[in-house]
C-alpha cells in the first residue's frame, strides 16, 4: 500500500512521488511525541500513517480499517452500505479528512440539508436540557435520495479584528447559526439550544486510550492554581454499564473512541451495539422503505468496527520539528512563561499493558510509553465568552457543564494546515490562526 511505501521510504531515506519526508536523525526527549509510535513526516499524510509496529496481520487489519474509515457509504443494503436514511456524514473521512479536521463547508455551501453538505456536528436540546422527541440529541441535516432531512442548518459569520500588544492583528469570526425546514415540529429559536462543533483531529488516539487513569486523576487533584484562575477536573460517564473516566471528545464525554456510535449516529449505519436506525419511529424510515431499502439487518459487522478501532489507535504521531531552531526555543519559553503548560501538560505516561480494542485485543506496543500530548485531558471552565463570542454552549455532557471544555492535545497541530488546509483551531471556528 502507499502507506507502507511511505514508511519504507522513511527508513531508507528515500522519497516517493514528491512526498515530503523529514530526513533527520531520531531525536530524544520532547521531539519523540509518542515514544515508539512517533513518525517523522511533514506532509499531508502526517496524521494518516501507521506507527512502525504495525506489521503482518495487523498491517492487513489496519488497511481494512483505513478503507472503512475513508470509503463513502452508500444507501444500498449489504457490504459498504447502510447509509441513512438520515445522517450527519457519509464516512468517517468526510468529517475527519486525512484523520484530521475539515473546513466548515457552510462557508461556501450556504446551508445544509437539501442545499449543501455540512461537515459539522449539530447538537440540539431544549432550554431545560431535555432532548426533542422528534429529533434526539443530534440534528441529522443530510438524507439519502427520496428522504427528508431533519432540518436545514444555515450560518452567517461576523468578523472582528483585534490586535496584540505589539500591534499584530488577528481576526475572530463569530458564527450565528439558524435551523429551518424542520421535518416535524418547528422549534422556535427561543426554545432551542444549538451547539455546532467542528470534528477533532484523530491524532494520538491509541495513546489516549492507553493513558493511566490514576495519573489523570492525580493531575485533577493538584490542578488548582487560584493565582491564575485555573483548575481542572475529570469527567466521569457511564458507558456499557460501567462508570469510567472520560477522555475523548470536546468535553471528555466518552471513555472510548466511539466507533460504534460514530457509525450509528453520524452515518445511520446500524451495528451490534446500536441495532436500531437513528430515526426509528420517524417518517424517514418509511420514506426509505418506499425507496426499496430494507432495515431489518445490521449494516456493519463487529469485526469491521474493530478494524476501524485498530486503524485509529495505531496511527503514528508526528514528531516535534525544528526543536533546535532559536525561534522555536523562544516560543517554548513563552509557552511556559504564559503558564500554558498548567493545562497543556507536556508529559504523560501510558499504562504498562497498553490499550485494548473493541474485542479486548491487547495493543502492548502502546504500553509503558512516555508521551508528550500537551494536554491534561481534564475539563476546564473556559468562561462564558471570548471577545463577545459565547463559549458556554449550555450543553451538558456527563459532568461537564456548558462552559467546561477538555484541554485539546496540541501534538501535531503545526501540521494541521498542511494536512487539512486553512481550518479553524477551536470547536467554534473562532480564531483563524494558531496565535490566538
Language-model features: locations:
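Single conserved hydrophobic/aromatic residue that forms the stacking wall/gate
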Residues: 1-6, 10-12, 427-436
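Bacterial Sec-dependent N-terminal signal peptides
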Residues: 4-7, 11-34
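Extended, non-globular alpha-helical segments
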Residues: 18-19, 29-30, 109-111, 292-300
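Short glycine/threonine-rich turn/loop motifs
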Residues: 25-56, 60-238, 317-425
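Ser/Thr-centered flexible coil motifs
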Residues: 55, 256, 301-302
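Active-site substrate-binding loop specific to GH73 endo-beta-N-acetylglucosaminidase modules
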Residues: 231-291
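Extracellular low-complexity, Gly/Ser/Thr-rich intrinsically disordered linkers
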Residues: 277-317, 327-333, 406-428, 434
Amino acid at each position: 500500500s502507499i502507506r507502507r511505501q511511505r514508511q519504507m521510504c522513511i527508513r531508507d531515506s528515500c522519497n516517493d512521488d514528491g512526498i515530503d519526508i523529514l530526513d533527520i536523525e531520531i531525536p530524544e526527549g520532547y521531539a519523540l511525541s509518542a515514544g515508539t509510535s512517533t513518525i517523522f513526516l511533514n506532509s499531508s499524510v502526517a496524521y494518516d500513517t501507521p506507527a512502525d509496529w504495525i506489521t503482518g496481520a495487523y498491517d492487513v487489519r489496519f488497511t481494512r480499517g483505513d478503507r472503512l474509515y475513508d470509503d463513502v457509504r452508500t444507501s444500498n443494503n449489504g457490504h459498504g452500505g447502510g447509509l441513512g436514511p438520515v445522517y450527519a456524514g457519509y464516512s468517517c473521512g468526510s468529517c475527519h479528512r486525512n484523520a484530521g479536521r475539515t473546513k466548515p463547508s457552510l462557508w461556501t455551501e450556504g446551508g445544509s440539508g437539501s442545499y449543501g453538505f455540512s461537515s459539522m456536528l449539530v447538537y440540539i436540546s431544549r432550554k431545560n436540557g431535555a432532548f426533542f422527541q422528534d429529533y434526539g440529541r443530534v440534528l441529522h441535516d443530510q438524507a439519502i435520495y427520496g428522504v427528508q432531512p431533519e432540518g436545514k442548518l444555515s450560518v452567517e459569520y461576523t468578523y472582528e479584528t483585534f490586535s496584540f500588544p505589539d500591534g499584530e492583528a488577528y481576526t475572530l469570526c463569530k458564527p450565528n447559526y439558524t435551523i429551518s425546514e424542520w421535518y416535524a415540529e418547528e422549534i422556535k429559536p427561543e426554545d432551542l439550544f444549538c451547539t455546532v462543533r467542528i470534528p477533532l483531529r484523530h491524532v494520538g488516539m491509541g495513546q489516549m486510550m492507553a493513558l493511566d487513569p490514576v495519573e489523570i486523576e492525580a493531575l485533577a487533584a493538584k490542578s488548582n492554581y487560584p493565582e491564575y484562575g485555573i483548575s481542572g477536573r475529570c469527567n466521569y460517564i457511564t458507558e456499557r454499564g460501567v462508570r469510567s473516566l472520560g477522555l475523548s471528545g470536546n468535553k471528555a464525554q466518552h471513555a472510548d473512541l466511539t466507533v460504534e456510535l460514530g457509525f450509528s449516529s453520524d452515518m445511520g449505519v446500524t451495528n451490534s451495539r446500536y441495532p436500531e436506525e437513528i430515526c426509528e419511529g420517524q417518517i424517514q424510515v418509511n420514506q426509505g422503505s418506499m425507496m426499496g431499502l430494507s432495515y431489518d439487518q445490521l449494516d456493519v459487522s463487529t469485526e469491521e468496527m474493530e478494524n476501524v478501532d485498530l486503524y485509529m489507535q495505531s496511527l503514528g504521531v508526528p514528531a516535534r520539528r525544528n526543536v533546535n531552531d532559536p525561534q522555536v526555543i523562544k516560543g517554548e519559553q513563552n509557552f511556559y512563561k504564559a503558564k500554558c503548560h498548567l493545562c497543556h501538560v507536556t508529559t504523560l505516561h501510558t499504562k504498562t499493558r497498553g490499550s485494548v480494542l473493541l474485542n479486548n485485543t491487547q495493543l502492548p506496543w502502546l504500553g509503558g510509553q512516555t508521551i508528550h500530548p500537551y494536554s491534561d485531558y481534564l475539563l476546564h471552565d473556559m468562561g462564558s465568552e471570548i471577545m463577545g463570542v459565547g463559549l458556554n454552549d449550555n450543553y451538558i455532557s456527563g459532568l461537564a457543564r456548558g462552559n467546561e471544555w477538555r484541554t485539546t492535545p496540541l501534538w501535531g497541530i503545526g501540521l494541521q494546515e498542511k494536512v487539512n488546509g486553512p481550518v479553524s483551531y477551536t470547536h467554534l471556528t473562532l480564531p483563524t490562526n494558531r496565535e490566538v
